[in-house]
């Protein structure tokens, strides 16, 4: 047996949903699960079950039934972490949390034909040990609210806002501002213009630029994709891949939604500079990909006790020196795009296509009419070679899916000016 590890994960979660003023049945879940891995003759054996450690490892070893080329970076980590919060939501009543949703729904009700609000909290406790001598334990709490409304005018439009971070109920301080943003924007959006089309100058807001760096670039630097040859960045370490103003970072130590103190292979979390001054400096690694490619481990994550795979955490474009008004002036004529409604990317080709929540025409360096149903597409590396970056960064929370697993992440960026193709969504 070359290597073994054991993970025990406890999850305690509460989900409340208020749809059109009606409360759905609260969903409370508490689960404990154990995952076992054994590396034998270069092949991984996996077993999941709430059994004694020796039995779990025996079952995992039985599943390592052939030979392979697997290997792992030997790292021994010892540590404990417990998140301190100002207001533990588990000390509060469900009624108080429901009342918050009702108050937020009242704010947006008059501008919506339908509403949906969700409150959630999740406490994750991970215990990890391995044959290298690692012994790690941590507890992290995440809390959040999402607010969604549909409005009707010349068109039917959907708008959503979220406030989610690691921490206790204090995370939701000021969440009513998100509701008031919907009240401000949605009545204008339902009567907004159709967007222009063609290649043009685009200013992405922090939210859309964050989605861009996560989806279009971040997945391309995950080392399992590199090993599979499924990324345009394979073989390009220490090459210039972007404008000198571009620095891209993945940092799980930031107190954002993608925070973790140790990854799911027991490696202590640390800030990773992926691109520095336009030069590709590193990929994101698990212990196995770090061994094969010579990188630094610490980005192996899993949902529950599923097999850990290479994932992002809090990924962002670092700040530069342009103010927002200066970006508009540099743009002169084009569009300003706000928020994201999803899209698609292909790390192997660098192509991406995203839908913004809404936007504004930019005329003579100033914001003009609002536009709706607008999309953005282009080639990731071509866009990054010709950008101007703002100086005020914001982060957006979300869940990232890969290989059937969802993990919490954040992406962030200042506003970014680029050239891209714009069209209808």
Curated annotation (Swiss-Prot):
Question: What Gene3D superfamilies does the annotation carry?
Answer: PmbA/TldD superfamily
- Kindly give the SUPFAM superfamilies that the UniProt entry links to this protein: Putative modulator of DNA gyrase, PmbA/TldD
Enzyme Commission no: 3.4.-.-
GO-annotated molecular function: metallopeptidase activity
One Gene Ontology cellular component term attached to this UniProt record is: cytosol
Query: What top-level class of enzyme does the UniProt entry assign?
Result: hydrolase
Sorted alphabetically, the Gene Ontology BP terms of this entry are:
proteolysis
Kindly state which keywords UniProt assigns to this record, in alphabetical order. Hydrolase, Metalloprotease, Protease
Pfam families, per database record: PmbA_TldD_1st (PF01523), PmbA_TldD_2nd (PF19290), PmbA_TldD_3rd (PF19289)
Q: Which family does the record claim for this protein?
A: Belongs to the peptidase U62 family.
What is the documented function of this protein? Answer: Probable metalloprotease.
This protein is called what?
Metalloprotease AF_0655
Source organism per UniProt: Archaeoglobus fulgidus (strain ATCC 49558 / DSM 4304 / JCM 9628 / NBRC 100126 / VC-16)
């Amino acid at each position: 047996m070359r290597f073994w590890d054991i993970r025990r994960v406890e999850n305690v979660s509460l989900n409340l949903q208020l749809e059109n003023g009606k409360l759905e049945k609260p969903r409370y879940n508490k689960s404990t699960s154990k995952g076992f891995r054994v590396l034998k003759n270069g092949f991984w054996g996996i077993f999941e079950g709430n059994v004694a450690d020796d039995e779990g490892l025996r079952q995992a070893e039985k599943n390592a039934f052939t030979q392979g080329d697997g290997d792992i970076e030997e790292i021994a980590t010892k540590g404990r972490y417990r998140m301190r919060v100002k207001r533990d939501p588990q000390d509060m009543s469900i009624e108080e949390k429901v009342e918050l949703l009702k108050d937020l729904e009242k704010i947006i009700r008059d501008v919506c034909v339908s509403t949906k609000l969700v409150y959630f909290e999740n406490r994750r406790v991970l215990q990890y040990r391995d044959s290298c001598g690692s012994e790690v334990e941590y507890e992290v709490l995440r809390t959040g609210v999402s607010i969604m409304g549909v409005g009707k005018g010349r068109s039917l439009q959907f708008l959503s806002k979220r406030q989610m971070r690691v921490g206790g109920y204090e995370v939701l301080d000021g969440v009513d501002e998100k509701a008031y943003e919907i009240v401000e924007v949605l009545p204008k959006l339902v009567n907004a213009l159709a967007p222009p089309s063609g290649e043009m100058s685009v200013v992405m807001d922090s939210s859309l630029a964050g989605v861009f760096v996560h989806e279009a670039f971040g997945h391309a630097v995950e080392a399992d994709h590199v090993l599979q040859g499924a990324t345009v960045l394979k073989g390009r370490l220490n090459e210039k891949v972007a404008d000198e103003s571009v620095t891209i970072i993945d940092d799980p130590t930031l107190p954002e939604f993608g925070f973790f103190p140790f990854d799911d292979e027991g490696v202590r979390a640390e800030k990773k500079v992926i691109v520095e001054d336009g030069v590709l400096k590193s990929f994101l690694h698990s212990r196995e990909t770090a061994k094969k490619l010579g990188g630094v481990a610490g980005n192996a994550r899993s949902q529950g006790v599923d097999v850990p795979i290479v994932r992002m955490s809090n990924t962002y474009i670092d700040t530069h020196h342009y103010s927002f008004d200066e970006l508009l002036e540099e743009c002169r004529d084009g569009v300003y795009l706000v928020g994201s409604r999803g899209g698609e990317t292909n790390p192997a080709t660098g192509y991406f296509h995203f839908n913004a929540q809404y936007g504004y025409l930019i005329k003579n360096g100033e914001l003009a009419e609002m536009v709706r149903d607008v999309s953005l597409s282009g080639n990731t590396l071509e866009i990054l070679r010709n950008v101007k970056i703002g100086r005020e960064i914001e982060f957006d929370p979300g869940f990232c899916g890969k290989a059937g697993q969802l993990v919490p992440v954040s992406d962030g960026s200042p506003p970014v000016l680029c050239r891209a193709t714009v069209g209808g969504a």
